[in-house]
Amino acid sequence: MSTSPVAIVTGAARGLGLAMVERLLAEGYRVMAADLASAEASWNYELGDINAMSAALEANGEDRLKTCPVDVTNADSCAECVDATLKHFGQLNLLVNNAGVVDSGPIDTFSEAAWDRIFAVNTKGIFLMTQAAVQALEGQENASIVNTASIAGKKGVRHMAAYCGSKFAAIGVTQSLAQELAPRGIRVNAICPGIVGTAMWLEHLMPKAKSTSNEIPDFADYVSQLIPMGEPQTAEDMADAVVYLARTNNVTGIALTVAGGMEMN
């Protein structure tokens, strides 16, 4: 049986999650890539589809990578994802709680349904996946949880009360779990991306965009005014941060900002 470490990555079908999966595979991990079963779930931009990702992976013959559907807002679904991982790989060393959604708008008209959905995915999802995985992580070598937060979890942004609130909460949950789980040998950290040209953000902020920031010349000009280092972050930058936090031995409870100097708190 392989002794290489095993990771679960949620929100894995595209964007940051897909880059994390690819980087973890390159680092020798075996990976369970988890996301919604269909991109047709109702939201203000196209969501990931793990079934489509699974078909592509099977065509490539990658045997260190498996996929499973997960709805991180549903406790049973989270438990089934962890169970599937243990059944296939036999262990779990790293949980990457990356699933997330975004929406924005003035408080006068922002819908209660959107508010609830954002908190359910971005914050409750961390709780449910961690609850499902914690016993499997305990006792494993260098067991670790990495949560995707945001620089919007460190500083409020106009018209983004729900998203910012959910990411502030994600950092608070990270710090609390780091305290609680340290005696059980599990480290818990967060990454805080800056402006990343993923489809989630481009399709929300720039509805005509459908894939990457490279297709939107104005995007680079826009972010260069906001970021001291002059260019947007990439999904690969976030994957680098996940690998660092997964591999280090004595770091827990931090919210690691990867934002080119845009946020220095």
Annotate each predicted stretch with a short phrase.
Residues 150:
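Residue(s) in the substrate-gating loop at a strand-loop-helix junction
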Residues 130, 166, 174:
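Active-site helix of classical SDR
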Residues 231-258, 263:
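C-terminal substrate-recognition "lid" of short-chain dehydrogenase/reductases
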Residues 106-107, 114-119, 223:
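Substrate-binding pocket helix/loop in short-chain dehydrogenase/reductase
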